[in-house]
Amino acid sequence: MTQQITVTEHLLLHQKQIPGATGQFTHLFNELVLSAKIISREVNKAGLVDVLGFTGEVNVQGEEVKKLDEYANRILIHRMARSGVLCAMASEENADIIEIPHGLPQGNYIIIFDPLDGSSNIDVNVNIGTIFSIFRRKSKLGTPVQSTDVLQAGCEQVAAGYILYGSSTMLVFTTGDGVHGFTMDPGVGEFLLSHPNMKIPDTGNIYSVNEGYWPYWSEATKKVVGHFKSRDNIHGKPYSLRYIGSLVADFHRNLIYGGVFMYPADDRDPKKPRGKLRLLCEASPMAMLIEQAGGRATDGTQRILDIIPDDLHQRVPLFIGSRHEVETISNIYKENEG
């Protein structure tokens, strides 16, 4: 049953337990929540107003930009820049680090986001989401932001989460003390605590992957996927395939039911030999969430949260979900790619 605890109340309770807390993080999160409400409003009426289809532009990833994707990006940049506690931002849609405009107050936090994950599904009314990651800067406040302030390993995150726009709008996040889910109550316009202390089952029976890319995978990756399609596993029968094609939606289902999401490296595009997903705005925040929920995340050989990025839009293979399934994947790669 939903508890009548708002996101702000939850954060303030947590803030009291931290010596020297200034309230800046809570203020930052309040702006993020407001952005989510604005984006959710537009998503819910997407078929009624002119926000479907493409803008005609191509983003830094070489992808055609959806109108709603561009809208979400613009809202997040505008709102978050005015939070007064950020020194920089980064977005999947922008080639470079986004600086806080001159004249606006700044702080020690950095936010990195994918404004609308799963945007290829927008026009067909499939669940989509916003993914975010929050760091503290390493350089001194008042000095220019350095690339090292943004290019931090996932284990340095102070918070991570996502907003899922579906049959209801949900905010799921962690600040390092477990994973908590809040559901938007449209009657009062607030996110209320609905899923406290979320935990992923230690093993599941779902695997999520686009098997259409099978011809482009390495032999080791084919053995990984083949393991879940066979009866030679912990369940003695094939896992169920469930794949939406929206990372947030697939991740959220597996978080609740257990299972594993996979986006392996492939050789479809020589420009993307490490797969499609971005380390900073997709893999790292999801990895922090899953580990806080008791799961695991790897690129096949290395823990996602240990990877130090060398590029703002660096891509990584991603295997994320229940502990048993991810450890099995790591073992298969170790045996076949040693």
UniProtKB/Swiss-Prot annotation:
Q: Which UniProt keywords apply?
A: Carbohydrate metabolism, Cytoplasm, Hydrolase, Magnesium, Metal-binding
- Residues annotated as binding substrate are D117, G118, S119, S120, N210, Y243, K276
| Pathway membership, UniProt | Carbohydrate biosynthesis; gluconeogenesis
Q: Which residues form the signal peptide?
A: none
Q: Which domain of life is it from?
A: Bacteria
Q: Which family does it belong to?
A: Belongs to the FBPase class 1 family.
Where is it found, in Gene Ontology cellular component terms?
Answer: cytosol
User: Example GO molecular function term?
Assistant: magnesium ion binding
Reported cofactor(s) = Mg(2+)
The record's catalysed reaction(s) read: beta-D-fructose 1,6-bisphosphate + H2O = beta-D-fructose 6-phosphate + phosphate
Q: What is this protein called?
A: Fructose-1,6-bisphosphatase class 1
NCBIfam families recorded:
PRK09293.1-1 (NF006778), PRK09293.1-3 (NF006779)
Provide the residue positions that the database annotates as binding Mg(2+) 2.
Answer: D114, D117, E282
Concerning PANTHER family, the annotation shows: FRUCTOSE-1,6-BISPHOSPHATASE-RELATED, SEDOHEPTULOSE-1,7-BISPHOSPHATASE, CHLOROPLASTIC
Residue positions annotated to bind Mg(2+) 1 are: E92, D114, L116
Which gene does this sequence derive from? fbp
The protein's matches in Gene3D superfamilies, at most eight in alphabetical order, are given as: 3.40.190.80, Fructose-1,6-Bisphosphatase, subunit A, domain 1
Per the UniProt entry, what species is this protein from, by scientific name?
Answer: Maridesulfovibrio salexigens (strain ATCC 14822 / DSM 2638 / NCIMB 8403 / VKM B-1763)
Location(s), subcellular: Cytoplasm
